[in-house]
Amino acid sequence: MKLNELMPSEGSRTNRKRIGRGTSSGTGKTAGRGQKGQKARGKVRLGFEGGQMPLYRRIPKRGFTNINRKEFAIVNLDALNVFDEGAEVTPESLLKAGIISKQLSGVKVLGNGEITKKLTVKANKFSESAVKAIEAAGGKTEVI
């Protein structure tokens, strides 16, 4: 065996069939599409179901998007334990600590988990249980 005699194994490399290139090519004339009809012609548009009422028109339209909706970044109490005792927790400090990814319309503190440190928490909204838990731990809440 010599390098110049190397050949790919039989059947591993085949040329692609170029369709519609004359009758003697084997895939000329109808190009493997059979005779006439919708499938022999161009593509049907997206969502077309052969004349049947398409799914996107059978299903009713529902609801709307409220342009005035405010979306708050949610923070639970157990996430606040990363801050030092007596620290002031603001939306900026939460962003810096990586607890929230973006500020959105503001920050809402919820009462899931336990808080073990005395903190001053400044946020746009608080749940009742969060306020009780923060004050029970000796901290303060402030709506900004």
Swiss-Prot record:
GO biological process, one term: translation
Bias (Gly residues): 23-35
Molecular function terms from GO: rRNA binding; structural constituent of ribosome
Renumbered residue ranges of the record's region Disordered: 1-44
UniProt keyword list: Ribonucleoprotein, Ribosomal protein, RNA-binding, rRNA-binding
PROSITE patterns: RIBOSOMAL_L15
Keyword RNA-binding recorded: yes
One GO location term (cellular component): cytosolic large ribosomal subunit
Pfam families tied to this protein: Ribosomal_L27A (PF00828)
Function, in words: Binds to the 23S rRNA.
Subunit structure: Part of the 50S ribosomal subunit.
Family membership noted in the UniProt record: Belongs to the universal ribosomal protein uL15 family.
Name assigned to this protein: Large ribosomal subunit protein uL15
